[in-house]
Amino acid sequence: MSKRKQVTIPIEKIQEQDKYIEQIHRQNEEYFNRTGKRKLVFTQTFGCQMNEHDSEKLCSMLEEMGYQMSMMVEESDLIIYNTCAVRENAELKVYGNLGQLKHLKGKNPDMKIAVCGCMMQQPHVVEELRKKYKHVDLIFGTHNLYKFPQLLTESINSDKMLVDVWDVDGEVIEGLRSNRKFELKAFVNIMYGCNNFCTYCIVPYTRGRERSRTPEDIINEIKELVANGTKEITLLGQNVDSYGKTLENPVSFSELLRKVNDIEGIERVRFMTSHPKDISDEVIYAIRDCDKVCEFLHLPIQCGSSSLLKKMNRHYTKEYYLEIIEKAKKEVPGIAFSTDLMIGFPGETEEDLLDTLDVVEKVRYDSAFTFIYSKRQGTPAAKMENQIPEDIKHDRFNRVLEAVNRISAEINDGYKDRIVEVLVEGRSKNNENKFAGRTRQNKLVNFEGGNDDLIGKLVMVKITEPRTFSLNGILVNN
């Protein structure tokens, strides 16, 4: 594959969007002065942290336009779905939600409906929306997020469906700036796209090829976040271990981790996602050496069968994966692992499933995102023979899930009476009288004691009650 030239949108082009933001803001203010009501927007995000971060940018633009966030579809003037194409279930939810909106649109013709994200990068999806969901007003993809104010302005002034989806070889944006709402924890993109072409995956077709941001841009963004109160950074990429290869002056991911670790004011650094074929010893050493980088590694295996991994085009074996795990355990005491487990890939046998269960037992994951394989149009796996019947998929899924949950509970049981460091994120969602936060190993902890002054601080908590998916405890006097 020839090396692709990275294209960065000039800042002047991004700033051109300000006039559209101001135009909509002016219209929304006039509406408020006339009615006493604010324009409301409902957003829903499907999929990965990349999509979540894109939605943060959209919400920042919407706030600048004068919209207020709403939790109710029925009362909203603008509805936005940021979609995911990785699994069929997420797509079906989007289609179902859009179908339900047809009735609301009939009652309120001024309502605007926008759909964006990875689903929209697939031509057959756009064609489906054109034919069957004509009440949708605006469709745009993953590469032209910065143009949203302009697209929304055009849509508001038109009764026709507006479609603006760029091909992956078109102009792409690196480093979109927005007046985002800074929180305690923040995602920071370090790269975009993927070059791996796993046979089941649609991401290279929807997110494009790998492009890395410069270390300078990444570090400047993090410093800005820290200045506004952010304590924990998660570095994002489809495959962070490939970071830097497309830069004019290549920088490795391990080097970037060390640079980020040196930024003053950061308490914790996390990253995802790593690829087993690309993670280097240097990355493991960086986790070991860098005091702010958390002892936690999300390392998707997908399945434990080397023969299936070859069919998936993953470029590693079960044995190689386990070697990485052992090296990480040796170099980073107390490290926790999470993974992705795909059940029911075409041709999967009982022996293949036993290999997956064997990996689960040997690694002992703290958590695992376990899911059933679903066909993705345009991927090689969708055309493979020996597709697994749904009943067998579900039976195998339940067996793997039982093992994952049992091991997670066993690991958590080992936390009884231990004192752990917790970054306090706020009040517990389940009990307003308690506080919640996470350990360096990404364990959710709900604890008693303290007050709101603790939010954003590192505290010590004694674990009194381990649970399957969380830990309960009490604040230790610091």
From Swiss-Prot:
Record's catalysed reaction(s): N(6)-dimethylallyladenosine(37) in tRNA + (sulfur carrier)-SH + AH2 + 2 S-adenosyl-L-methionine = 2-methylsulfanyl-N(6)-dimethylallyladenosine(37) in tRNA + (sulfur carrier)-H + 5'-deoxyadenosine + L-methionine + A + S-adenosyl-L-homocysteine + 2 H(+)
- Radical SAM core domain spans which residues? 180-410
- Name any cofactors this protein relies on: [4Fe-4S] cluster
**MTTase N-terminal domain boundaries:** 39-157
Enzyme Commission (EC) number:
2.8.4.3
Q: Where does the protein principally reside?
A: cytoplasm
Question: Where does this polypeptide localize?
Answer: Cytoplasm
- Cofactor binding mode, per the note? Binds 2 [4Fe-4S] clusters. One cluster is coordinated with 3 cysteines and an exchangeable S-adenosyl-L-methionine.
Q: What does this protein do?
A: Catalyzes the methylthiolation of N6-(dimethylallyl)adenosine (i(6)A), leading to the formation of 2-methylthio-N6-(dimethylallyl)adenosine (ms(2)i(6)A) at position 37 in tRNAs that read codons beginning with uridine.
* Quaternary structure (record): Monomer.
Q: Which family does it belong to?
A: Belongs to the methylthiotransferase family. MiaB subfamily.
The name this protein carries in UniProt is tRNA-2-methylthio-N(6)-dimethylallyladenosine synthase
What organism does this protein naturally occur in? Clostridioides difficile (strain 630) (Peptoclostridium difficile)
Its encoding gene is what? miaB
